Amino acid sequence: MALSALSTLQAAELPITKNSPIPDFQNRTQDVAPYDFDAPPQGLFRTITTAEGFDEELGLHRTHEIVPVKPTTLFSPDTQAVFIVFYLHQHYQGFQVFGRCYPEAVAGLDPTVVIGQDAMHIALEDDSGYLTLSPPKGAWKPGRYKVEIHVGEQVNEMSLMGTMRFTIVAEKR
């Protein structure tokens, strides 16, 4: 009985805090930058880059690590493939990374039509990967291309993570 009286006495002595408005606990809009889906993806991706190729190396924990070879955003029209190589933060389930290529500023091509795409399944133990984009109809036309990066089980309006860009430069004569 004496123990419960003591705890009641201590509880009664606690100060009462004022009711704070909910905005005091929320992020202020001026402190939060909006996410840009028209820029390289962030969040899940530690790094992501376009490259002329990739190598597979043995990682720190004896895992397969995909590393870019000759990272660049400028390619020649005779390039056999453009690679998008990425490193991921830790994740807790498998998923797919999709790349959908559009001709953003290429003469004679509709910028709304997908001209190439690739997907890679990422297993739980994977921390890197790559996408391969082959030229449409055998050769790249000079101009700027954009690649939408999607993550999930399928491509839809909610799976877009960001956009990568590369340029095919005209050959020097």
Listing of model-derived features with the role each one plays in the protein:
Residues 14-59:
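A eukaryote-biased signal for short, well-structured alpha-helical docking elements
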Residues 59-93:
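Contiguous beta-strand segments within globular domains
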Residues 99-103, 149:
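Conserved aromatic beta-strand anchor motif in extracellular beta-sandwich/beta-rich domains
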Residues 111-125:
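Solvent-exposed serine/threonine-rich low-complexity stretches and specific carbohydrate-binding patches
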Residues 123-134:
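Aromatic sugar-binding surface patches on proteins
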Residues 143-150:
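A short tyrosine-centered beta-strand micro-motif
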Residues 157-173:
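Short beta-strand elements
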